[in-house]
């Protein structure tokens, strides 16, 4: 309160993804008079990023991506600015934009998301080489595939799994190149991947494992082939790069904000600088499941962190208690769910049940008899039941010391094993 009147607070949010958009709307719920400014390097309001690949096969329209409409910010009195942030200057409490403008803040949330990793391959700037991170990327790919017959996907992770399904729908010849020994390395192990690889190959899709791109070749500045480390050359019209993401934090160099892989934040989503918060793909925060500060680049976690940051920026005292990462893919009749830690390591135990004949897999990761992760793959799995059950079992510390044998049963009763053994 200043001179008997409440000061109107200035909230500035960098990034319009799930963390930034959620935070903006949450701030408005708690502060109806505050000035909220959201800055994004995209010319779109909040949209469902995980569905953009469906534009390629026309499985959805562009309008379907805008879950809350295209006037979300106007309807909530949020100022939207399309621009790039060049610098954050904490001592002056303002940010500098690419166009030279400065914006003052009382509270700043950095939710700048990530960018696709692109290596310095020879020929990487040829026409026909794309990424699939944002809406503009997807629109460009959707336009190019109309006159294409072949596509090479560099990387075999979750985005690649979604992409091949859509490229197959429109009849493209597809080749996947993956550096690891198996597909979706973050979720699958070699045994599980074999089941999916078999089905993908049956669809006429080519897979190159333990391979790397060394060069893109072209004619008249247009992509014509991809050269691998082995010397093999693959003719193609389009290449899509899906080898990973990196947090957008370069603009914070020399700002004083503590960064490493991401932006270090405490359990309130606060950085080391007063009144500056971070959330989403850029936030590096201690997680009890991993017992170390980590990045959690998932949609659900970004929304959760954005909401917590917003509440604390408006005077609440809410803490982030960690999250259980959940990822899922669906491809050619298979569904897979990866929850928590899905790869065993030192001092961890693994219990797995794999049937190549029935094309079914279950893997559980235990630490001192407590469930810390699970991977489920099959043709008919109830993911709407499994996701919350497994997430709760991990979060609430389920001890399975007396029910390990049940994990190997074909007709497993997840509720019986996990929900009845939660430590409270």
Where are these regions (language model features)?
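FAD-site-proximal beta/loop scaffold in flavoenzymes
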Residues: 125-146, 220-227, 232-308
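Cysteine/selenocysteine-centered motifs that mediate thiol-based redox chemistry or coordinate metal-sulfur cofactors
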Residues: 397-424
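Mid-to-C-terminal Rossmann-like scaffold of FAD/NAD(P)H-dependent oxidoreductases
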Residues: 8-9, 16, 29, 282-384, ...
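Cofactor-binding loop segments of dinucleotide-utilizing enzymes, especially the Rossmann-like FAD-
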Residues: 16, 39-41, 134, 156, ...
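A Rossmann-like FAD-binding core segment of flavoenzymes
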Residues: 33-35, 76-97, 103, 170-267
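Beta1-alpha1 glycine-rich phosphate/pyrophosphate-binding loop at the start
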Residues: 8-78, 164-187, 385
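FAD-binding core/adjacent interface of flavoenzyme oxidoreductases
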Residues: 2-12, 68-152, 227-233, 240-242, ...
């Amino acid at each position: 309160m200043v001179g008997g009147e409440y000061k109107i607070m200035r909230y500035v949010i960098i990034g319009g993804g799930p963390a930034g958009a959620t935070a903006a709307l949450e701030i408005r719920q708690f502060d109806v008079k505050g000035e909220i400014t959201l800055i994004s390097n995209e010319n779109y309001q909040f949209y469902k990023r995980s569905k953009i690949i469906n534009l390629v096969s026309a499985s959805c329209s562009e309008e379907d991506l805008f879950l809350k409409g295209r006037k979300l910010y106007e309807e909530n009195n949020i100022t939207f600015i399309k621009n790039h942030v060049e610098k954050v200057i904490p001592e002056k409490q303002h940010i500098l934009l690419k166009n030279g403008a400065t914006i003052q803040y009382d509270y700043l949330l950095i939710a700048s998301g990530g960018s696709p990793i692109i290596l310095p391959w020879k020929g990487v700037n040829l026409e026909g080489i794309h990424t699939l991170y944002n809406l503009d990327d997807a629109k460009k790919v959707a336009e190019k595939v109309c006159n294409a017959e072949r596509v090479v996907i560099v990387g075999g992770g979750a985005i690649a799994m979604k992409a091949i399904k859509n490229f197959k729908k429109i009849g493209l010849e597809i080749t996947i190149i993956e550096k690891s020994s198996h597909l979706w390395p973050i979720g699958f192990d070699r045994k599980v991947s074999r089941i999916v690889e078999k089905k993908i190959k049956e669809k006429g899709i080519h897979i190159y494992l333990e391979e790397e791109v060394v060069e893109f070749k072209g004619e008249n500045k247009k992509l014509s082939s991809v050269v691998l480390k082995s010397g093999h050359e693959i003719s193609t019209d389009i290449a899509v790069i899906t080898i990973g993401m990196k947090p957008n934090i370069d603009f914070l160099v020399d700002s004083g904000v503590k960064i490493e892989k991401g932006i270090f934040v405490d359990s309130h989503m606060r950085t080391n600088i007063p009144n500056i918060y971070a959330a989403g793909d850029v936030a590096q925060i201690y997680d009890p499941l991993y017992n170390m500060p980590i990045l959690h680049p998932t949609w659900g976690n970004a929304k959760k962190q954005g909401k917590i940051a917003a509440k604390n920026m408006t005077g609440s005292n809410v803490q982030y208690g960690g999250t259980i990462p959940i990822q899922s893919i669906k491809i050619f009749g298979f569904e897979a769910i990866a929850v928590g830690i899905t790869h065993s390591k030192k001092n961890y135990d693994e219990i797995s049940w794999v049937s190549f004949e029935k094309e079914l897999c279950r893997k559980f990761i235990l630490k001192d008899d407590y469930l810390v992760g699970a991977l489920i793959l099959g043709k008919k799995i109830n993911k709407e039941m499994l996701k919350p059950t497994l997430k709760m079992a991990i979060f609430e510390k389920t001890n399975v010391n007396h029910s390990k044998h049940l994990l190997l049963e074909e007709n497993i009763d997840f509720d019986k094993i996990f929900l009845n053994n939660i430590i409270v």
